[in-house]
């Protein structure tokens, strides 16, 4: 018993570390008296769709299928359960008065993501142990626990980390199926494990549609082993689980088809300014997404581990590759290339790294064991440091809030202008700026020149362009201050947008820099600049907690 406890201690420590990294800063960007919506632009969409359902009134379909429905149901259930026990009020009538209750709904959904993120670390250990032994499982769990992208994305009420959780479970049950088929009694257990693998693959695709690819390893095993029953059980259970977790696919077919088609067209053909001219998708995924998401030391280790897998070509390598290769191709061929799309690959990356580290650090005569372990520990320590630096801004005052506080000290009356339509990346001079749809805040602004009365009784006059980078904001309205967000200018300047360049030229003639708000970049990344404005070398959706905010003041 004592030996079992001692053997379990490293895993417990890894899971505790994973929890700490994912819960640290969990309240970042939640609604407050100054902004009624999360600073993460997708969270309000997910929460709104989830809380739009009501089991007590028979409204059981979300009517929203841009994401799969499973996570919406889980968030709705968690918040409804909290309501039953008096932890939260799910009926929000006035955001100005009920913003604290609204924030709790977000927080409950985020806590669910944290649990699934930590759960993925455990599943990664279990899968690594089954494929390559206890040591490989521990190393793999340790790698995923400190992977920067996974830790960051596990903070948010979104679908990527939950989808990766279900996908990892599908792989674990597929590995069990494979072991059972090659064991002493393949007929007894294999089909049961195949049933579980299919169910988890169906739940993964009911969370995020492209996770339907997680059924491929099971199908590969069924074909290679010539097990028709495995194929049929896996496909049938996956389809049944998908329809149970996303019933709108069968009961609200027209809306479901329209939303899925919209996402297909958007992701495959409409890169927008954010991803325009970003080069080859396969190269971008490595040099931009994984470079930032893993950190340089872990990226190098991951590339080495892939080479090692290509040499070893063990059965487990084929199992992982059956999902990893098609999925990597899908996200690399897409026109929209958010870093979060790579999250389902992170457990597999950790597994390959874990196997390499386990073999690398295995005791051997005359093998420089201490040096090998020290090198492996150094990679994890550097990755942990990178993870901490990436997550830390969520535990600090957000640059948007710091900019708002700075403007709050300005003399009154104050007119503030913007280069582009204010949204989630803008200091909340209106508490409605971060509404899910850009420009939605105007519905809550008085007619004529928009104004906002803040919590301290200060009235802001807001000068907002009819079109982004309209120099009339400066030449006709002459606001006292002009606010720029990194989300406004980063891609516009990268693409040499003539309107943006003209606006900045006019801005510099009439205005002087007054304040800059940002935080430190992650390790192995750097602060850069475009046309003299600060930028951070991070993917678009990894920058949410820490965009640079610039304030210019009218020259005297």
Predicted regions and their residues:
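Transmembrane-helix signature of polytopic, membrane-embedded enzymes
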Residues: 9, 13-14, 18, 87-97, ...
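Hydrophobic/aromatic-rich transmembrane helices and adjacent perimembrane loops
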Residues: 153-154, 160-163, 204, 209, ...
